[in-house]
Amino acid sequence: MSKLFYAFAVLAVHVLTSSPTTAASNLPVNLVTGPAFTTPAGAAHRRFLRSIHEGEDSLKPSAFSEERTALRAMAYLLKPKQKKLAAALKKSTSKHKLSVAPEKMKSIQVLGDPKNPEREWFKRLYNSKRGDPQTLRKLGQFKTEAQLSRYIKFYDDMLAKAKNVRVQTK
């Protein structure tokens, strides 16, 4: 049913657009864009930007020869702007290098730091029932191999501390 409706709608649009009455109804709109509308009778001729009219011009001859400007003159005008942009680009790249440094430092944090969140996480993993590094690796607890290697080092340090405590208490 809807296909039939769309077919009739397309047919109606086609008939209305091809009708000569449609073109006649648009005639007053087309008169607005005609030459009588753009240049009123008795008014002084004014030159619009890039118009091709000859005759009385309110603009000086140098102003309407904009297309004939030498490329070297344009390049000369653009040089200061290019220098400013180059300096800004140089600043932005050096600033970017400095902003990457704290991220790199986070990944190299010392595990002995008590405020290190990774150390706290490692402590929780170590105290859990499955604190073994290989078991945790199989469970997918570590995002990267570097994180796994840091946990193995932490695990070995904790085992060494536990052995020292046992030896001292005996």
UniProtKB/Swiss-Prot annotation:
Coarse class of the protein's main subcellular location: secreted
Signals that turn on the gene: Expression is induced during host plant infection.
A cellular component annotation (GO) from this entry: extracellular region
Phylogenetic classification of the source organism: Eukaryota, Sar, Stramenopiles, Oomycota, Peronosporales
Entry keyword set: Host cytoplasm, Host nucleus, Secreted, Signal, Virulence
Leader peptide range in chain numbering: 1-23
Keyword Secreted attributed: yes
Protein name listed in UniProt: RxLR effector protein CRE16
Motif (RxLR-dEER): 47-68
Compartment annotation: Secreted; Host cytoplasm; Host nucleus
Keyword hit for Repeat: no
Membrane spanning residue stretches: none
